[in-house]
Structure formats: C-alpha cells, structure tokens
Amino acid sequence: MELTINTEKETADILDAFIKVAPYLNSLVQDDITIGIYDTEKLLVNIPAKTFSLNVKAGDPLQEGDIITDAIRSNQKKTSMVPKELFGFPLIARAIPLHDENGRVIGGVGLGTSLEESSKLHDVAESLSAVVEQTAAAISDISESINGFSTQMSGISSQAKKVSESAGEIADISVTVKGISDQSNLLGLNAAIEAARAGESGKGFSVVADEIRKLATHSKENVGQIDQITKKIHSLLKGLEESIESINQHTDGQAAAVEQISATMQEISGSAQHLAKMAEKALEEE
C-alpha cells in the first residue's frame, strides 16, 4: 500500500513539475507553440499559443489516433505534420511519453508549432524563384534578339559598303565617259572646221560633225548628272554607315547590359532557389 502511495505521489510530482514549467516554455523559444500536459487518460493542462488555439481544454480525454495518445500507448516519441485544412494553417505536432523513476509511462507532453510563417516564406520563395526564372527567360530572348539584330545590322553595313564601292566604280566610269565626251566634242569641232574649209562638198559632213558635238555635249551633261547622283549616293551611304556604326555601338552596349542583367538574374535565381530549399527544409525540420 505504501509503495502504491509513493508511486502515485511520484507520478503527481512529475506531472505537476511539467505543469508548472509549461507556461514559461513559449517565452523561451522563437516559434509560437501550444503545449499540452497529459496523464494516461486525459489532458491535464493546455497552454495556448500566442496566435492560435487547438480548441482543447483540461479534462478532455485522450482520443484514439491523436499523436499524444500514440506516444503514450507506444512509449515512443512521435512527430506529425498537420495539414492546414484541419486548423486553417499548417502545424507540426510532437509528443513524448513521460516516465517515472522506474521507467513506467505516466503521461505525455504534446507540443504544437505553427508553420504558417514558414509556409508563407516557402510560398514567397517559390513564387520569387518562378518570377526570376520567367524574367531570366525573357532577358535571354531579348539578348538573342539583340544579337540577331546586331548580325542583321552587320549584314546591312556590309551591303552598304558594297553599294558604296559600286558607286565609286560608277564615278570612275563617269570620268572615263566624260573624257570620251570631251574628246568627241573636240573631234566634232575639228570636223566642223574641216567641213567649212571643204565648202559645198563638206556640207553633209558638217551635219554629221554637228550631231557628234551635240551628242558629246549631251553625254557630258548626262555624265554631270550621274556624277551629282553618285556624290549624293556617297553622301547618303556615308550617313548610313555612320548611323549603322552608332546603332552597333548602342547595340553592343545594350548586349553588354543585358548580359550583366542576365548574370545578376541568375544570381538572384540561385538565391531564390536556395531560399526556397531552406524554407522547405525548415518546414521539414520544424
């Protein structure tokens, strides 16, 4: 009889010690926790968390399937994730059996920790990671477009140089034609002089000489117009080349800036993924 009394007193003392300490535990940890102290039949005391309650009260009997009941019945530490559908937020529950000096199970302690903030952090990290990946993909597309545009501009510049070379060839031909025109005009003039000397017999030749001079004059005028057009083409091509060069410089600058942004986005993406993994790990370890 005395042994039974001592055992009951020891059990009461152990449970009472936990009951006295329980209210202080929430202040000792960073997480927001709720604590329940149980004997082998019922809840003795519940210390609610700062931001949530499990809607239990002292005297509530142990429920089959509850983590604390499993811990007490199996004499083992138990951990379980409680989905947010049950209480409106995710929760991790832990339970351990309590023993007397002889190792007999006399009750248990249940601990509930809200994972709401960790879950939010995980969701934000995953969302950030997704946004960063989308942004990085968009930047990659922009970079490809810039590189493609730069290639096209290089092609245009090359074609413009070829046109400029062709215009130069036209100018050279114009010089030659002008020389021929001047020579033809001189020959026409000499022929007209000789026709005049020939008198009546040279009239027919005089008409031909006049036509040669008219043709030479007309050719010279055309050559002058061609020369003006060629110079204008040269001027336009020079302006085009300068514009292309300016565009290429800006494009190179933009490409470099995009590469820098892309590198930065990759770093951010890596950090976001690391943050998501840390948040997920925190959820698993809570």
UniProtKB/Swiss-Prot annotation:
Protein induction: Transcriptionally regulated by SigD; part of the yfmT/yfmS operon.
Stored InterPro entries: MCPsignal_dom, Sensor-like_sf
Gene Ontology CC terms, in alphabetical order: membrane
Pfam families: MCPsignal
Keywords, ordered alphabetically: Transducer
Any one GO biological process: signal transduction
Family that this chain belongs to: Belongs to the methyl-accepting chemotaxis (MCP) protein family.
Name of the protein: Putative sensory transducer protein YfmS
Source species of the chain: Bacillus subtilis (strain 168)
Taxonomic lineage: Bacteria, Bacillati, Bacillota, Bacilli, Bacillales
Gene: yfmS
